[in-house]
């Protein structure tokens, strides 16, 4: 058979409905919206081709490799219920297409090029199945949930945090003071805002020093281990590591990184440094909505969450669930479990397209943050359970009596909810009552 040039249909090569997926394949679920007149099989096959071995035409060099061994395959297509001309295309990628231990390379391959494809109106990556063989090439979170609890000596309850506000404009000294008040009042952690890096009004080194002072003072006075997420995010990887090194020299327990704006390569480097040096790593997802907000285009956050667990982080922001729609709650809990658990069953009602086995990669604590306050505490305790970080920014600093009483109010509310739950009370039904009872004993909570 001679070599035959020319453009050909992708589906002839890349649509293989009878393919049996291998345990080592990376599986992807894409939400495909084809252009009018493009059949779904062709659209699904085009995605498989462009994100693996294909190009728009047959090339002579195809004969020098084994396409069967290296090509992505669209092995199943199903229409999306209730949506016109929208399909879920399942694609299987051979493991050899990806560099070991590189989230960066995985994304470059799977989502690098296909999203601008002419034959598609829109494309969204809904889920990825990471095979154990690939997961094992990643270090993952620097420490994970269990090690973090042992380091902090805090068990049987969610952890409490607070983002220091106003996020921009405070001097380092005043910033450290706010940190001290919150930790002294009863929080476990305070947090640099994601856009606090090293600006003219507060350089990073000054902030690190005053926050460390606040941590040590609060620890001495409360007898509890405290932390402040020192944001090490910087303009270069070298500068980021320099800040992490300084944090380690100060002896603080945790640093922070913006993993999407900072990039996966920088994040993985920082995660490796953190494991080697006993630092916990808090991850903020600034920029995620740019990627995950559109329902029919982009990447679903559950994929970004899986990628973070592979790249490495001990905490990650994951939405609050409270006050959102019922469906959102199930979807959010789906990726919260993907972050924490070792083995997660496929469950389409929670948006989980594939069974995921993490083979003992450490878990990540989900962080609920943004617009929550003490009256949400029962719901948050019930929804997220013990393995979570609950962050009240304005909900702490907005207390009429100040920061420390705001922290006291949150801690009292949390302890009351945990105690009530352990006594078998129904937090969903009696939540407000539980908070009201607790506020009889805590003027700070009553004032909140």
From Swiss-Prot:
<dbReference type="GO" id="GO:0009853">
    <property type="term" value="P:photorespiration"/>
</dbReference>
<feature type="site" description="Transition state stabilizer">
    <location>
        <position position="324"/>
    </location>
</feature>
<feature type="binding site">
    <location>
        <position position="285"/>
    </location>
    <ligand>
        <name>substrate</name>
    </ligand>
</feature>
<feature type="active site" description="Proton acceptor">
    <location>
        <position position="284"/>
    </location>
</feature>
<dbReference type="GO" id="GO:0000287">
    <property type="term" value="F:magnesium ion binding"/>
</dbReference>
<feature type="modified residue" description="N6-carboxylysine">
    <location>
        <position position="191"/>
    </location>
</feature>
<dbReference type="GO" id="GO:0004497">
    <property type="term" value="F:monooxygenase activity"/>
</dbReference>
<feature type="binding site">
    <location>
        <position position="317"/>
    </location>
    <ligand>
        <name>substrate</name>
    </ligand>
</feature>
<dbReference type="GO" id="GO:0009507">
    <property type="term" value="C:chloroplast"/>
</dbReference>
<feature type="binding site">
    <location>
        <position position="369"/>
    </location>
    <ligand>
        <name>substrate</name>
    </ligand>
</feature>
<keyword id="KW-0503">Monooxygenase</keyword>
<keyword id="KW-0488">Methylation</keyword>
<keyword id="KW-0602">Photosynthesis</keyword>
<feature type="active site" description="Proton acceptor">
    <location>
        <position position="165"/>
    </location>
</feature>
<feature type="binding site">
    <location>
        <position position="194"/>
    </location>
    <ligand>
        <name>Mg(2+)</name>
    </ligand>
</feature>
<keyword id="KW-1015">Disulfide bond</keyword>
<keyword id="KW-0479">Metal-binding</keyword>
<dbReference type="InterPro" id="IPR036422">
    <property type="entry name" value="RuBisCO_lsu_N_sf"/>
</dbReference>
<feature type="binding site" description="via carbamate group">
    <location>
        <position position="191"/>
    </location>
    <ligand>
        <name>Mg(2+)</name>
    </ligand>
</feature>
<dbReference type="GO" id="GO:0019253">
    <property type="term" value="P:reductive pentose-phosphate cycle"/>
</dbReference>
<comment type="function">
    <text>RuBisCO catalyzes two reactions: the carboxylation of D-ribulose 1,5-bisphosphate, the primary event in carbon dioxide fixation, as well as the oxidative fragmentation of the pentose substrate in the photorespiration process. Both reactions occur simultaneously and in competition at the same active site.</text>
</comment>
<dbReference type="InterPro" id="IPR000685">
    <property type="entry name" value="RuBisCO_lsu_C"/>
</dbReference>
<keyword id="KW-0120">Carbon dioxide fixation</keyword>
<protein>
    <recommendedName>
        <fullName>Ribulose bisphosphate carboxylase large chain</fullName>
        <ecNumber>4.1.1.39</ecNumber>
    </recommendedName>
</protein>
<keyword id="KW-0560">Oxidoreductase</keyword>
<keyword id="KW-0601">Photorespiration</keyword>
<keyword id="KW-0456">Lyase</keyword>
<dbReference type="InterPro" id="IPR036376">
    <property type="entry name" value="RuBisCO_lsu_C_sf"/>
</dbReference>
<feature type="binding site">
    <location>
        <position position="167"/>
    </location>
    <ligand>
        <name>substrate</name>
    </ligand>
</feature>
<dbReference type="InterPro" id="IPR017443">
    <property type="entry name" value="RuBisCO_lsu_fd_N"/>
</dbReference>
<dbReference type="GO" id="GO:0016984">
    <property type="term" value="F:ribulose-bisphosphate carboxylase activity"/>
</dbReference>
<keyword id="KW-0934">Plastid</keyword>
<feature type="binding site">
    <location>
        <position position="163"/>
    </location>
    <ligand>
        <name>substrate</name>
    </ligand>
</feature>
<dbReference type="InterPro" id="IPR020878">
    <property type="entry name" value="RuBisCo_large_chain_AS"/>
</dbReference>
<feature type="binding site">
    <location>
        <position position="193"/>
    </location>
    <ligand>
        <name>Mg(2+)</name>
    </ligand>
</feature>
<comment type="similarity">
    <text>Belongs to the RuBisCO large chain family. Type I subfamily.</text>
</comment>
<keyword id="KW-0460">Magnesium</keyword>
<feature type="modified residue" description="N6,N6,N6-trimethyllysine">
    <location>
        <position position="4"/>
    </location>
</feature>
<dbReference type="Pfam" id="PF02788">
    <property type="entry name" value="RuBisCO_large_N"/>
</dbReference>
<comment type="subunit">
    <text>Heterohexadecamer of 8 large chains and 8 small chains; disulfide-linked. The disulfide link is formed within the large subunit homodimers.</text>
</comment>
<keyword id="KW-0150">Chloroplast</keyword>
<dbReference type="Pfam" id="PF00016">
    <property type="entry name" value="RuBisCO_large"/>
</dbReference>
